[in-house]
Amino acid sequence: MQGRLDQSILNLPGVELARRNLEAALLLLKALMEQGLSQAVLCPGSRSGALALALGVLEPRGLALYTAIDERSAAFFALGLARATGKAVAVVTTSGTAVANLLPAAVEADYGAIPLLLISADRPTRLKGCGANQTVNQESFLAASVRWFGQGDGTGLAAMTDAAIDALARQAWSGTRPPDLAPGPVHLNLSFAEPLHAGGQALLEATAHASLDTTSSPWGELGLRTPGSGNQAPPFSPAPDPDQPGV
């Protein structure tokens, strides 16, 4: 596939693949900000962990970030922001039925000619059609209402080259205002392979890879210790493993 890194990227040790997931998420969101994205609404979830962490890194760098528990409410909140500003606002969700909850706002954005950027995390293609938890055909959920639909590599966003990620982000942003149609919603569906969460040194390296100023990384705001600051215990250690399918 054009724009794919060597397949061995997905066979990296866990920490390195988690770092690449975060790098890819940062590169995508940074490219969207360069196109004009200035506001995003985040809904909590495990599969979208890299996107959530990337949004947190970018918040002090010019991105207004809001959080919401309910995806339907989040999408309508973003719709209101987009209507007020005339610029697309991003809504970021996890996989599964979370995506279905975006449909009402997508319909409103479609008929109201309001630009809206709906970004959903997804499981890799290999987990589709085999009974994996929270795995559905979310690619088609919003198809009837969006101006444009795009996907990352089916094996995982981490498998795409930096240039391909940048191009995908630019396509998504331009899709909110197509030259031959009224403005409207777009759906960007992104697969992420486990492990999903990077922290510590991996976070610092991913931030540097995305050409972001690492001296102002909001470590405290993200609940992480600064790399090299000592062997401090993490703020919490949940019992379930968030990097495993089905969580």
Locate each region found by the language model.
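N-terminal alpha/beta PP-like core and its mobile active-site loop of ThDP/TPP-dependent enzymes
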Residues: 2-247
